[in-house]
Amino acid sequence: MDFELEPTLESIVQQDTLKWIFVGGKGGVGKTTTSSSIAVQLALNHPNDQFLLISTDPAHNLSDAFCQKFGKDARKVDGLSNLSCMEIDPEAAMSDLQQQAQQYNNDPNDPLKSMMNDMTGSIPGIDEALSFMEVLKHIKSQKVDENDDKDKISYRTIIFDTAPTGHTLRFLQLPSTLQKLLSKFQALSGKFGPMMSMLGGGNQQEMFDKLNEVQKNVTEVNEQFTNPDLTTFVCVCISEFLSLYETERMIQELMSYNMDVNSIVVNQLLFADDDEKPCKRCVSRWKMQKKYLDQMAELYEDYHLVKMPLLGTEIRGVENLKKFSKFLLTPYDPKVNGDLVTSLEEK
């Protein structure tokens, strides 16, 4: 390229059209801290808009990051009135789905019901599927127009703190997977619907009507996920071989889904060159990190490559996230920002 992209996420934070931001990467690389930092900066830079941060990771670390308990319903972050968080529980969603299924037909020998259970159970990443449906349900309940009640919320952007890489990619496959599944259900409705109604399955039509509505929502979201004006993916990694390898694999797969990805956040960097008295281990590790950073700079020259420092403590609480997240917009400089990092470590 003839020019180097700025090493920040400024373009994402300032982009007016973004509706969805996915944050993902290998386990243990700082996805939750990064997604929380992005959400905090969005909220700070756009105080008149509402934002929602959702964890689809079964480990659920948002409560730890903000030092505040979150659950399956969106809850405001203390200290940031325009940011809400929620943690989706796939197991609870599965239980709800099983209970709802009973209302349509209590006959365990119903062949259509048995077939549907088999098909549902064969979805790759059923827990992610249920998480996805939970997100759709919640967003739809929150979406408002001019005639809705004023106490309802319309979110400008929704940020996903995703599960480790493999789960993330299955989650992103779900729109197309669910579309195929629902198409099969619709085909069954055409073939067996009249017969099931004659046999007393009057509720079958209601079920298929709901499935049609779900398919419409899934199709709409799928179109948004592949629109770079509406959706982007932020990769998170550390400067090590396995993490770099996983990041490249993930980027290639995201591109196969036609998803926009042009930003990489590299966490846990030592910057030992600027340390007055670095230990031998720090120097050795920094040399290793620098080797892979140089490879990333060459491999991802057309990406925003954001370098975040390693701290001696965890980043927890809104105030600490506000300080740390600044480095997503202004590149970290050890000589300039050293005191800020020290203050974060002392808390």
UniProtKB/Swiss-Prot annotation:
Catalytic residues in the record: D57
SUPFAM superfamilies xrefs: P-loop containing nucleoside triphosphate hydrolases
GO molecular function, a single term: metal ion binding
GO cellular component, one term: Golgi apparatus
EC annotation from Swiss-Prot or TrEMBL: 3.6.-.-
InterPro entries, alphabetized: Anion-transp_ATPase-like_dom, ATPase_ArsA/GET3, ATPase_ArsA/GET3_euk, P-loop_NTPase
GO biological process terms, semicolon-separated: tail-anchored membrane protein insertion into ER membrane
Annotated Zn(2+) binding sites: C279, C282
Main location: cytoplasm
Keyword terms: ATP-binding, Cytoplasm, Endoplasmic reticulum, Golgi apparatus, Hydrolase, Metal-binding, Nucleotide-binding, Transport, Zinc
Chain positions recorded as ATP binding sites: K26, G27, G28, V29, G30, K31, T32, T33, E240, N267
Record has Nucleotide-binding as a keyword: yes
Cellular compartments annotated: Cytoplasm; Endoplasmic reticulum; Golgi apparatus
Superkingdom of origin: Eukaryota
Keyword Hydrolase on entry: yes
Database matches in Pfam families: ArsA_ATPase
Family of this protein: Belongs to the arsA ATPase family.
PANTHER family given in the database record: ARSENICAL PUMP-DRIVING ATPASE ARSENITE-TRANSLOCATING ATPASE (PTHR10803), ATPASE GET3 (PTHR10803:SF3)
HAMAP family: Asna1_Get3
Task performed by this protein: ATPase required for the post-translational delivery of tail-anchored (TA) proteins to the endoplasmic reticulum. Recognizes and selectively binds the transmembrane domain of TA proteins in the cytosol. This complex then targets to the endoplasmic reticulum by membrane-bound receptors GET1 and GET2, where the tail-anchored protein is released for insertion. This process is regulated by ATP binding and hydrolysis. ATP binding drives the homodimer towards the closed dimer state, facilitating recognition of newly synthesized TA membrane proteins. ATP hydrolysis is required for insertion.
UniProt subunit comment: Homodimer. Component of the Golgi to ER traffic (GET) complex, which is composed of GET1, GET2 and GET3. Within the complex, GET1 and GET2 form a heterotetramer which is stabilized by phosphatidylinositol binding and which binds to the GET3 homodimer. Interacts with the chloride channel protein GEF1.
The protein, known as: ATPase GET3
Originating organism: Scheffersomyces stipitis (strain ATCC 58785 / CBS 6054 / NBRC 10063 / NRRL Y-11545) (Yeast)
